[in-house]
Amino acid sequence: MSLFKEETEQIIKDSEDRVICRYTLTDNLNKYAEGILYFSNEMFKFISGKYGNGYAPKGKYKAYSGQLKHRQENSYQQFGFGWCLPLGAQFETDRSGLMLHPDGGVEGTLGCIGLHFESLDENVKCYNLLRDYLDKSNILNVEIV
């Protein structure tokens, strides 16, 4: 088994009870990163940054039950379905307002984790995984690495 495959399998296993967002800088000048969000044995592509202060700071965050909301704005929708989940940093930072959400409209975010879905089904699946976990557990740990 390759090292990359072993590492990916371990991240998937570790993401059963938390979200792990792993990114790589793709454009340091524009502070743009691309990555994979791992959660509950699933993987979803995302981007972070390109605008404002750029990609999300690495670290630990928390999301809370009751904060996952439907959104109608184009920048929070893909395939006609929009939502967002605010993230609270668990470390000292001057950044605020970071969220998980579909990356609708013009590609890029102000630092949020902007998810890129292949279909409406994938978008709804991610939303439902987050909703169901938060309904059961009240708090979701999120790590950006």
Go through each PLM region and give its residues.
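Cell wall/extracellular polymer interaction/catalysis modules
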Residues: 1-110, 120-145
